[in-house]
């Protein structure tokens, strides 16, 4: 195991983290005791291997660090911590941050503008987040900044850039792409009908296949009851990729009623 110079007595530090308190958020309460224990073990390894860097006066404490690590590891609970090996630092601003964005239009002209971002990730680069939106990721609303950026990292394991198609068997790529684009078109149809703000799925999912995969990954873990019945074929593909079925966790929770069932095949 790599020993990072900024991590001294890392095992002792992680053991002292308030894991029970960190787990006490709506997103994680439906995990079984066994799943919670395995998630904590992954989160401990995550904190041993990654550096959390607080920026612009933001202050990290033990509970914040533990919750951030748990959210990073939820998507790879069944995949393994090695799926997060494409970065070493997580930079955390207190609020959404401004970046200089460069883009090329349809006729080849390059434009520069300053834009506000909630998070960013690059191939072999750090993940950048902001605490304001991380806090909004604790519930089961369909929004989760950390899962969104982790999905981009998982996506980029299949090539130099995010494409919306993660590392899956080659024989499944065409079907995955077909179902993903069908979902994008369906979301766009709803946007055209009711507008972006009234769309039941974040309108950002309709902009690009990579963003569709990332946004629907947010819904997969935090609002499966919205994702599964609307896009059942794509839901099964997500279950097969992540090797999890969050909808079954909802069904097994006695506080949830009338939850449709789904099974990983």
From Swiss-Prot:
Domain of life: Bacteria
Positions that bind Zn(2+): 111, 148, 152, 211
Enzyme Commission number(s) of this protein: 3.4.11.-
InterPro entries for this protein: MetalloPept_cat_dom_sf, MtfA_enterob, MtfA_fam, MtfA_N
Keyword DNA repair among record annotations: no
Keyword line: Aminopeptidase, Cytoplasm, Hydrolase, Metal-binding, Metalloprotease, Protease, Zinc
Protein family according to the UniProt entry: Belongs to the MtfA family.
Role description: Involved in the modulation of the activity of the glucose-phosphotransferase system (glucose-PTS). Interacts with the transcriptional repressor Mlc, preventing its interaction with DNA and leading to the modulation of expression of genes regulated by Mlc, including ptsG, which encodes the PTS system glucose-specific EIICB component. Shows zinc-dependent metallopeptidase activity.
Protein name as annotated: Mlc titration factor A
Organism this protein belongs to: Citrobacter koseri (strain ATCC BAA-895 / CDC 4225-83 / SGSC4696)
């Amino acid at each position: 195991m790599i020993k990072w110079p900024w991590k001294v007595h890392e095992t002792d530090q992680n053991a002292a983290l308030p894991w029970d308190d960190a787990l006490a958020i709506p997103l994680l309460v439906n995990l079984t005791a066994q799943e919670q224990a395995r998630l904590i073990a992954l989160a401990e390894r995550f904190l041993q291997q990654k550096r959390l860097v607080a920026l612009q006066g933001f202050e990290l404490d033990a509970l914040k660090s533990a919750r951030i690590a748990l959210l990073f590891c939820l998507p790879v609970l069944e995949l393994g911590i090695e799926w997060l090996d494409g970065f070493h630092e997580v930079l955390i601003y207190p609020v959404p941050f401004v970046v200089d964005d460069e883009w090329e239009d349809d006729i080849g002209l390059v434009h520069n503008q300053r834009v506000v971002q909630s998070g960013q990730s690059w191939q072999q680069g750090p993940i950048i987040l902001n605490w304001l939106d991380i806090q909004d990721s604790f519930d089961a609303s369909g929004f989760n900044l950390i899962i969104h950026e982790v999905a981009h990292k998982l996506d980029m394991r299949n090539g130099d850039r995010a494409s919306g198609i993660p590392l899956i068997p080659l024989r499944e790529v065409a079907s995955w792409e077909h179902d993903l684009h069908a979902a994008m078109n369906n979301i766009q149809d709803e946007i055209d009908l009711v507008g972006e703000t009234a769309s039941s799925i974040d309108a950002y999912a309709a902009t690009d296949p990579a963003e569709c995969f990332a946004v629907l990954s947010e819904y997969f873990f935090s609002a499966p009851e919205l994702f599964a019945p609307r896009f059942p074929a794509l839901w099964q593909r997500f279950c097969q990729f992540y090797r999890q079925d969050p909808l079954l966790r909802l069904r097994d929770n006695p506080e949830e009623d009338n939850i449709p069932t789904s099974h990983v095949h």
